[in-house]
Amino acid sequence: MNFEVFALGTSGMMPLPNRFLTSAMVRRDGDLFLFDCGEGTQISLKMLNLKWKKINTIFISHMHADHVTGLPGILMLSSQVDRDDPLTIYGPPRLKEYIDANRRILDMYINYEIIVKVAHPGILIDNDEFTVSAFPLAHTKPCTGFVMEEKLRPGEFHPELASGLGIPMGPLWGKLQKGFSVTLDDGRVIQP
């Protein structure tokens, strides 16, 4: 399990020849999570050989054009690469209206389900391996920041070392493997 972060676009307000508008991608064990989707996002994805249909979730911070103008193209292209899985998009309250208007005006054919959710402050995704949380940011209009945080994973446990230290097999071994210190009957504190 590992996280890889790709800066797809680092320019603000207007794209530059070598810098597209705001977007970032996190790849985690083959799944892709897109944070903002400015103009040029498709080009960056193609240059980095990141697959559109692997995008599980998109997070949009706010409704300024430099953060959302790439979204219609990503949504249309995902249909052309035979996407089957639903796509969840978190963002501001008017994001669904923006997506629906683009679908209608551009006559977009979408062959998969798009689930649009308002990114209220707090935990948006919580599974066994990571969380994604939203929090308000100070900006010229309502804006949301996102944190993707990996949960603690059990470390490698060495039973022979535990036995050698006199730690009895059982619940104490489990606590050590999960990263917790344990206190033995003789008062010794064993660190993981």
List the predicted regions and their residue ranges.
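Conserved beta-strand hairpin/beta-sheet module of binuclear metal-dependent hydrolase folds
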Residues: M1-L48, P86, F146-M148, G155
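Generic structural signal for residues in well-ordered beta-strands
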Residues: V5, I114-V116, V132
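Short glycine/serine/proline-enriched coil/turn segments at secondary-structure junctions
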Residues: M14-L16, M108, H139-K141
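Active-site metal-binding motif and surrounding structural segment of the metallo-beta-lactamase
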Residues: E39-Y90, K117-H120
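Alpha-helix N-cap/helix-start and coil->helix boundary motif
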Residues: Q42, A65, L95-K96, H139-T140, ...
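Structured loop/turn residues at beta-strand edges in well-structured enzyme cores
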Residues: L50-K53, Y112, D128-F130
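Active-site neighborhood of divalent metal-dependent phosphoester bond hydrolases
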Residues: R83-V118
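Metal-dependent phosphodiesterase/nuclease catalytic metal-binding core
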Residues: H120-P192
